[in-house]
């Protein structure tokens, strides 16, 4: 049994929850994620010794493009996710993971522009189900933008692209009352 404490910044407040999960290394249990039939969320099925626990991650849509954010806590980092063509991983300074990154994708061939607000990016991973093509990506954290040019994606294949900032410029967490 693994006790995982998940912490997230939600609406300006730090939220902490506890997930009790089977130890995947001991029992071979796997956390599986799938898109719900109504396409409103990605649901994680987490095996525990008292049954399957479910967690939902919001699934957003911009036209025909779907995307969701994940990677907070051990459960989300070890899950098996649906095949979205692009996975962006955000890091900064000495922090292995950052969130709140605003992302703009451009397809130079036809001028398509998609903008994903930082508020939708609550974890260090951003999964985007893009149509086949070559894209330019701009990722902005704390006013500093990183560029990735000529990234080619194909449906059915996952491209993982790491985006790193030299310094951590993510917003400060709210002070906690004593």
Regions found by a protein language model. Name each.
Residues 1-4:
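Positively charged n-region of N-terminal signal peptides that target proteins for export
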Residues 8-19:
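Bacterial N-terminal signal peptides
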Residues 25-105, 144-178:
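Primarily secretory-pathway and cell-envelope proteins
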Residues 109-123:
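Short, acidic Ser/Thr/Gly-rich low-complexity loop/linker segments typical of extracellular
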Residues 116, 126, 149-152:
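Beta-strand-rich interaction surfaces with strong enrichment in secreted/lumenal proteins
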Residues 123-129:
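Short, surface-exposed beta-strand/beta-hairpin micro-motifs centered on an aromatic residue
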Residues 131-132, 155:
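Surface-exposed loops/turns
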Residues 133-140:
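A short tyrosine-centered beta-strand micro-motif
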């Amino acid at each position: 049994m693994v006790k995982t404490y998940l912490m997230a910044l939600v609406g300006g407040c730090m939220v902490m929850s506890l997930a009790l999960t089977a130890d995947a290394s001991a029992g071979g249990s796997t956390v599986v994620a799938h898109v719900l039939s109504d396409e409103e969320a990605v649901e994680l099925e987490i095996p525990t010794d008292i049954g399957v626990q479910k967690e939902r991650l919001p699934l957003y849509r911009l036209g025909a493009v779907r995307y969701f954010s994940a990677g907070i806590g051990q459960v989300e980092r070890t899950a098996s996710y649906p095949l979205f063509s692009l996975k962006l991983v955000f890091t900064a300074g000495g922090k292995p993971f950052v969130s709140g990154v605003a992302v703009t994708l451009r397809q130079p061939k036809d001028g398509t522009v998609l903008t994903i607000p930082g508020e939708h990016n609550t974890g260090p991973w951003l999964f985007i189900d893009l149509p086949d093509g070559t894209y330019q990506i701009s990722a902005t954290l704390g006013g500093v933008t990183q560029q990735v040019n000529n990234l080619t994606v194909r449906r059915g294949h996952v491209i993982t692209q790491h985006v790193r900032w030299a310094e951590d410029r993510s917003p400060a967490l709210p002070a906690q009352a004593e």
